[in-house]
Each structure stands twice: as structure tokens, then as C-alpha cells.
UniProtKB/Swiss-Prot annotation:
<feature type="transmembrane region" description="Helical; Name=7">
    <location>
        <begin position="304"/>
        <end position="325"/>
    </location>
</feature>
<keyword id="KW-0547">Nucleotide-binding</keyword>
<feature type="glycosylation site" description="N-linked (GlcNAc...) asparagine">
    <location>
        <position position="197"/>
    </location>
</feature>
<dbReference type="GO" id="GO:0090075">
    <property type="term" value="P:relaxation of muscle"/>
</dbReference>
<dbReference type="GO" id="GO:0001621">
    <property type="term" value="F:G protein-coupled ADP receptor activity"/>
</dbReference>
<dbReference type="GO" id="GO:0030168">
    <property type="term" value="P:platelet activation"/>
</dbReference>
<keyword id="KW-1133">Transmembrane helix</keyword>
<protein>
    <recommendedName>
        <fullName>P2Y purinoceptor 1</fullName>
    </recommendedName>
</protein>
<feature type="topological domain" description="Extracellular">
    <location>
        <begin position="189"/>
        <end position="214"/>
    </location>
</feature>
<feature type="glycosylation site" description="N-linked (GlcNAc...) asparagine">
    <location>
        <position position="27"/>
    </location>
</feature>
<feature type="glycosylation site" description="N-linked (GlcNAc...) asparagine">
    <location>
        <position position="11"/>
    </location>
</feature>
<dbReference type="GO" id="GO:0071318">
    <property type="term" value="P:cellular response to ATP"/>
</dbReference>
<feature type="disulfide bond">
    <location>
        <begin position="42"/>
        <end position="296"/>
    </location>
</feature>
<feature type="transmembrane region" description="Helical; Name=4">
    <location>
        <begin position="167"/>
        <end position="188"/>
    </location>
</feature>
<keyword id="KW-0325">Glycoprotein</keyword>
<dbReference type="InterPro" id="IPR000142">
    <property type="entry name" value="P2Y1_rcpt"/>
</dbReference>
<keyword id="KW-0812">Transmembrane</keyword>
Length: 373
């Protein structure tokens, strides 16, 4: 199924042909005048895949992310005390992922409803805000985890004072403040718009009215909160790998956890973060500067690829729990212990209920005068 959207009206990333205020579509004179005055804009061609691909991905992310991060938060709160510095960062990462997956049911319904948003402008803004808070909060907390592991591997003695839990708490609070302040403009840029067919879109970026300033803002956040952390992470991992090669850490838990950390974080960046930021930037550039008849097919392909990377960007909420399990401090051992304890408690409860049931049956027989037992 292909939906061709009107080129003469703004074509936001989620939808096009929004009705302009005060514009009368039934007036042929006004229509011809506006068409002559308006610059050419490519018609945004929507293929049916986005109505099924994105909700399918979000359903998987919601189920796995909700279960995985719920277990992680439960473990950190009840079974991981006292926390180490890296546990503080991982708890905050799990919290950011959990808050994000809670917003996915509304987004799943939105795409199954043919991108007709019914939850109001405030909920649309909150939806896009939480997505970006999770995106950049996750990147910064992964950077903190990587720097923490780098200090422990490369400078194990010098870093003892710097790796305390108290410092990790202060840094985590600072990360949340930085992310919330940096992402707060999303509350202005995002929002809803009314299409010509009276359905409502929820912009994942912004409308064409604010596109130029949004592009500048997007580039600033991409450089400051994606490119810089990526360079820091790559630097940390390069030095970690070098230390693992030259230091006598064969078969040590620190070596194993460090290798897992490098593999998982680099996989998350390669699959989720890098493609999303590249295609988001290309899509914004296409909307701004590639509006010629010759570029319309290219723009459609960029837009379709960008939609694919939006789904990939949400997968980090599923992958992060694997990080806690493989690279966390004693997480796997304590999870196994907590599971065994819960299993023993369950068996004890079942045995107790069975004994109570047996006693009740015997009591009833005695009351009825049955002496055959």
C-alpha cells in the first residue's frame, strides 16, 4: 500500500499535507495562487511497511525491555546492595530504559491506527521527550560505565578513590540534569499537526515551520551527546584492550567482564545509535535542501531508511539487560542466588499448603467418625 501525500503543504517527518490556518482548500483561486507562490516540495510517499514494521519492533522492545529492565531494577534494589560505582550507573541506565518502554504502548497504537494520534498534544510532546531522554541518557551512562571500567583496568590503584559509589551518585545526578536540560527544547519542537484528511500526526522531529532551527539544534545535540561520547568510549576501549593484552589478567573476572563490556557497547552503537543519527541527519537535510523533482525518489528512500533506524534505536532497551548480566559486578551470581532463594521459598510454600490440606482432610474424616484410617 502506498500513500502519496500532497507536495504543496508541509511534509513533516511523520506526515504531510497539514492544513494551513486560514487556508480554504475549496477555493480554486486561493489554491492556484498558493500553488504558484509556494516553493516546490517533494511528495512524501509512505509505504505500508512503516505501519507494521515499527509497531512490530516496538512490541518486541516493550515485552523484552519491560521484563529485562524490571528484573534488573528488582535486582539492583533488593539483591545488589551494597552498590559499587558501576552498579549505580547500571541502575540509572535500567531506569532510563524502563521509563522509555512504558511509553511504547501509545506509540504502538499510533502506528496500528495508521499514524492517527488520539492522545493529545501534551502526550505527543512527552512521548518524543522521553525517547530522546532515554537515547542520550543511555549514551552518557554507557560512557560513564566505560570510563569506570577503563579506570579500574588501566589504573587499578590510582583510581580506587575515584571509583567510590558516592562519586558515581554525583555523576549520575549530573548526567540526568544535563540530559533533561539539553533535551527540553524537544518539548517545543515536537507536537501534533492536523492533516488535510483531519487525522492527527505526532511529529517525531518537528514541522516545516521550525525545521531550520531544529536542524541546528539536532546537530548540536548529535555532536555534544553522541559524537563526543562515542570518541571517549572508543578511546577508553582502545586503552582497555591494550591493557588486557599487556597486563597479566588471563582468565580473571575483570578481564572477562571488560571484554563483554567492549563487545556489547560497541554492538549497541553499531546497530542502534550510529545508523539512527546518520539517517536522522540525512532526512533533515533532505527536507531542507533536497526539494527538487530529481531528488524526490532519493528523499523517499532516505525517509524509509530513517524509519528503519528509528526501530533500531529502540533496541538498546532490550540489549542493556544483557550488559548487566555479563559485565556487571556480581550481577549474574546474585541473580542466580535470588532465583534459587525464590524457588526454595515457592517449594516451601507448596509443601506447607500440601501439609495443611492433608491435616484438614484428616480432621474432616475424624469429625465424620471415619475410623478406617
Amino acid at each position: 500500500m502506498t500513500e502519496v501525500l500532497w507536495p504543496a503543504a508541509p511534509n513533516g517527518t511523520d506526515a504531510a499535507f497539514l492544513a494551513s490556518p486560514g487556508f480554504h482548500w475549496g477555493n480554486s483561486t486561493a489554491t492556484s495562487t498558493a500553488a504558484a507562490a509556494a516553493p516546490f516540495r517533494c511528495a512524501l510517499t509512505k509505504t505500508g511497511f512503516q505501519f507494521y514494521y515499527l509497531p512490530a519492533v516496538y512490541i518486541v522492545v516493550f515485552i523484552i525491555g519491560f521484563l529485562g529492565n524490571s528484573i534488573a531494577i528488582w535486582m539492583f534494589v533488593f539483591h545488589m546492595k551494597p552498590w559499587s560505582g558501576i552498579s549505580v550507573y547500571m541502575f540509572n541506565l535500567a531506569l532510563a530504559d524502563f521509563l522509555y518502554v512504558l511509553t511504547l504502548p501509545a506509540l504502538i497504537f499510533y502506528y496500528f491506527n495508521k499514524t492517527n494520534w488520539i492522545f493529545g498534544d501534551a502526550m505527543c510532546k512527552l512521548q518524543r521527550f522521553i525517547f530522546h531522554v532515554n537515547l542520550y541518557g543511555s549514551i552518557l551512562f554507557l560512557t560513564c560505565i566505560s570510563a569506570h571500567r577503563y579506570s579500574g583496568v588501566v589504573y587499578p590503584l590510582k583510581s580506587l578513590g575515584r571509583l567510590k559509589k558516592k562519586n558515581a551518585v554525583y555523576i549520575s545526578v549530573l548526567v540526568w540534569l544535563i540530559v533533561v536540560v539539553a533535551i527540553s527544547p524537544i518539548l517545543f519542537y515536537s507536537g501534533t499537526g492536523i492533516r488535510k484528511n483531519k487525522t492527527i500526526t505526532c511529529y517525531d522531529t518537528t514541522s516545516d515551520e521550525y525545521l531550520r532551527s531544529y536542524f541546528i539544534y539536532s546537530m548540536c545535540t548529535t555532536v555534544a551527546m553522541f559524537c563526543v561520547p562515542l570518541v571517549l568510549i572508543l578511546g577508553c576501549y582502545g586503552l582497555i584492550v591494550r591493557a588486557l593484552i599487556y597486563k597479566d589478567l588471563d582468565n580473571s573476572p575483570l578481564r572477562r567482564k571488560s571484554i563483554y563490556l567492549v563487545i556489547i557497547v560497541l554492538t549497541v552503537f553499531a546497530v542502534s545509535y550510529i545508523p539512527f543519527h546518520v539517517m536522522k541527519t540525512m532526512n533533515l537535510r533532505a527536507r531542507l535542501d533536497f526539494q527538487t523533482p530529481e531528488m524526490c525518489t532519493f528523499n523517499d528512500r532516505v525517509y524509509a531508511t530513517y524509519q528503519v533506524t528509528r526501530g533500531l534505536a529502540s533496541l538498546n532497551s532490550c540489549v542493556d539487560p544483557i550488559l548487566y548480566f555479563l559485565a556487571g559486578d556480581t550481577f549474574r551470581r546474585r541473580l542466580s542466588r535470588a532465583t534459587r532463594k525464590a524457588s526454595r521459598r515457592s517449594e516451601a510454600n507448596l509443601q506447607s499448603k500440601s501439609e495443611d490440606m492433608t491435616l484438614n482432610i484428616l480432621s474432616e474424616f475424624k469429625q465424620n467418625g471415619d475410623t478406617s484410617l
